[in-house]
């Protein structure tokens, strides 16, 4: 599983919005070093996923519209359109020619178990904790 650049940018946008204030796209792009055209694309997804609210006009801007304590990294990845599977055979509807010919696949079973553990770990990490967590990047005990 890899967190794409798009999800990385989404996390950076949410980090700016942690203060509860409205921010312009230009400000967020400059602060978080996100190309402006990508920021707009990402904000559309975050807005469609009800994570942020975007208002237009002179007093417009972007602000959080979700509870970051109740929203997980797994949720964000879903909003961004990431399936987050370890292997293509984990995709829904994937037809494995090997399993069709030979039956049960031990590799698939082991990867499925790892996939479940990974999904559980990503579900257990709130966005607030991820974005505002402690100062030691090696310490994941509180996550």
Language-model-derived ranges and their functions:
Residues 49-65:
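Beta-hairpin "wing" of winged helix-turn-helix
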Residues 3-34:
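N-terminal helix-turn-helix DNA-binding core of bacterial DNA-binding proteins
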Residues 31-34, 40, 68-70:
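Compact, glycine-rich, soluble single-domain proteins
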Residues 39-49:
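Basic amphipathic alpha-helical segments that dock to polyanions
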Residues 25, 31, 56, 65, ...:
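Solvent-exposed interaction patches of small proteins and small membrane subunits
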């Amino acid at each position: 599983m890899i967190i794409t650049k798009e999800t990385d940018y989404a996390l950076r946008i949410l980090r700016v919005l942690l203060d509860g204030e409205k921010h312009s796209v230009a400000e967020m792009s400059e602060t978080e070093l996100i190309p402006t055209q990508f920021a707009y694309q990402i904000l559309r997804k975050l807005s469609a996923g009800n994570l942020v609210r975007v208002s237009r006009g002179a007093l417009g801007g972007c602000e959080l519209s979700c509870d970051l304590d109740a929203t997980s990294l797994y949720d964000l990845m879903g909003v961004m359109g990431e399936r987050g599977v370890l292997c293509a055979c984990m995709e829904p509807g994937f037809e494995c020619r090997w399993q069709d010919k030979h039956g049960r696949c031990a590799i698939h079973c082991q990867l499925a178990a790892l996939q479940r553990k990974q999904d559980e770990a990503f579900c257990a990490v709130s966005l607030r904790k991820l974005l505002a967590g402690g100062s030691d990047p090696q310490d994941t005990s509180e996550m």
